[in-house]
Every structure is written in C-alpha cells, then in structure tokens.
Amino acid sequence: MTESVLDYMTRLGRAAREASRVIGRASTAQKNRALQAAADALDAARAELTAANELDLAAGRANGLEPALLDRLALTPARIDGMITGLRQVASLPDPVGAIRDMSYRPSGIQVGKMRTPLGVIGIIYESRPNVTIDAASLCLKSGNATILRGGSEAIHSNRAIATCIQRGLAEAGLPAAVVQVVETTDREAVGALISMPQFVDVIVPRGGRGLIERISRDARVPVIKHLDGICHVYVSQHADLDKAWNVAFNAKTYRYGICGAMETLLVDQRVAERFLPEMARRFQEKGVELRGCERTRALVEAKPATEDDWHTEYLDAILSIRVVNGLDQAIEHINHYGSHHTDSIISEHQGEARQFMAEVDSASVMLNTPTCFADGFEYGLGAEIGISTDKLHARGPVGLEGLTCEKYVVIGDGQLRGQGTC
C-alpha cells in the first residue's frame, strides 16, 4: 500500500522530534565536526551535485521557467564553493546553546539567570534557490535544532543531493540522519501537513514570495518567523550632509534591486529637496532607475506620477518612489503607515533628530547615515542568517544562530525554603 503524504510527513516529523533530543544535547565539537564533514562531502560530490542540478535546470527550461529563476536555481562551481565556505563559517561561529547570562542573587539567597536552549524542530519552506538548503541546515544544526526542509519542486534533485552530503557529515559525527531531512515529495499537500504538526514541529520559517508567506501565516498551526515585504525607506532630513545622502541613497537602491533590504521609497525634507533631488535624479536616471514621484517631486525632477499603490509596493526592481515631506514627523508617519517594519534609514547630522527617528520608527532595523541594504545577518556580525523577521515576538530583524534558540530560567539555591527568612 502506498504511503499517503500525511503519513509520510508524520513519519518525518516523528523522526525529527526524536533527533532533536539528540542534537539538542550534542557538544559544540560534535556539531562542528558534522558541519566540517558535510563541507568535505560537498567538495567530494561536485560532480553529483552538478548532475542533479542539471536535471532541475533541464526541467525548468522545459517548463518555461523565467531566466531569472533559472539563474537562482543554478549550482555553479562558485556557488558550490560558497556553500562549502558557508558550512565552515557556521562551524567557526560561537555556539549559543547552553550560554548562561544575567545570573544574580535574590534576597532569598537563590541565584536566577537565563540559559540559551534550542527551539527543537524547525520547518523551513522555501523556493528555487538550493543553496538555502545549506544555509538553513547548517544554522539549525549548529543551534542544536533538527530541521525539516521543504524546498521548491523545481529544485528537488539538487536539494536531495545536498541533503545526502549533509547526512554524510552527520553520520561521521555520530549524529542521526533525521537531524536534517528534506521532504522528497513535490506534492503541495506536504506543506499543509508540515505547518499543521505542532506535536512535531516547533516553528516554521518560510522563505519565498508573498503568496507563499501569506498562505503559511494564515494556515499554520505552528508559530511562524517571517517577513512579508521589504518596503524600506531612506529619509533625507534638512540636516543631512548632501554628499553623504546622495551616496547612501544611491547605494541603498542600486546595490542589488532584488533583495528585501533595497530602498523602495525615498523621502526628502522640503527644505533640501530643491538642492538634493536634481542631482539624485540624475544619478538614478543614468543607472536606468525609473522614478515615480509625488507632485512636489515632479515639480523638481522628471518622474512618473506616484500613485497610492506605489507607496505600498516592494518593487524588487529598478523602480523608486520619491516623496517630498514637510519634515521629520511626516517622514516617520509615512514610514509607519506605508512601510513593512523591515529597515528604514535617516540621513542627518542632527543627533536629536536621529534619536527621534530611531525611537519612533516601528521597524526591525533603524539606521543612521547607512544604506538599508546593510540589513543582513553577515553585515550585523551574526554570520549566516535564516531570514529576516519583521514580527515582534521571539526574533526581530536578521535571524542568526541566537534567533534559533530560546531562553529558560536557571535557578540555583543551597536549600533555601520559600516562606522562611527574607522571603
């Protein structure tokens, strides 16, 4: 009798739960040994990885996959090198598990502190890019979590080949293969099952398009770490150094159009707009960036009319919305109304103004004189990241190793009894 998708996912979930107890108590040395061995296995399996990836690319071309998606799907030699380097980098990162902080004596004589512990089992749902398999698996492994990886159907052969290398590394370190499992069915019912197993899965991390993330957020019976959009702003204040502002705003938009930290809306104080915008527009237009502006913007530079929808849009493309605002308060109001709580930056030399912006803008990252494209786990010193969260519960901003752990209280006494002495 053929196993149903639900039975298959239940089997994966049960195995992951059992494996989480093993990896959760594994030593740092054992986890690092698994990561290094997995890197060696990837290096030795380049031919197998390339062959598996070619199957996915051929299927993608046959199915009319767009060139940009085919590019994301490709495992080039450089990308395989990057995956190997990524595994070794995660192995070199400090292990957050077991770290104790804030130990202090209470009047009763007991000591109270907090210890970092793994979350347990993490389900990762993602699209296209097979290198996400390595990023997710390595971070979950190092943070003491088991993981179930459900990649896009277009990368199924690549993901299987990568998972085989990871499991070789786990075996060499004496850890169960179920610490990292790839869902090997392309049936979409598997996603529904994965997000509906709170008895086996502790948290879901979706990485992909808005439709995928909205569906998971709506239907999941398991907590979700996510962000929907990256509608990031740069505000050029009346106290900005304009040379700095031109460079920062240009980099924020053009570093890479397709990342969630790219600037999508530029806000400019009305008192500097006439001096700032013509040169800024010239630079963007030379780069081929399409400008969409409010009426005050269009009175100063050539731009298409911006609509209400533009302020709500994450373009992920060479398109930029520009609005001239009355000042700091209106800029903050605009960001909090239209933004996605991801990353927003102010360009200013005025400390009080910068402090107000950072205190009142409701985003996971707030920046001063810095392009929003710096919103990245590597740039923040976290090493690799599993994603960026715009939620306020558990993790916010780039989610690295520590974001894949939680805290429990540690209480140490020497026979103290409550209700006696100073209690």
From Swiss-Prot:
Its main location: cytoplasm. Its EC number is 1.2.1.41. GO terms for molecular function: glutamate-5-semialdehyde dehydrogenase activity; NADP binding. SUPFAM superfamilies: ALDH-like (SSF53720). It catalyses: L-glutamate 5-semialdehyde + phosphate + NADP(+) = L-glutamyl 5-phosphate + NADPH + H(+). One of its GO terms (cellular component) is cytoplasm. Pathway: Amino-acid biosynthesis; L-proline biosynthesis; L-glutamate 5-semialdehyde from L-glutamate: step 2/2. The keyword NADP applies. It is an enzyme of class 1 (oxidoreductase). Catalyzes the NADPH-dependent reduction of L-glutamate 5-phosphate into L-glutamate 5-semialdehyde and phosphate. The product spontaneously undergoes cyclization to form 1-pyrroline-5-carboxylate. PANTHER family: DELTA-1-PYRROLINE-5-CARBOXYLATE SYNTHASE, GLUTAMATE SEMIALDEHYDE DEHYDROGENASE. Belongs to the gamma-glutamyl phosphate reductase family. This is Gamma-glutamyl phosphate reductase. The gene is proA.
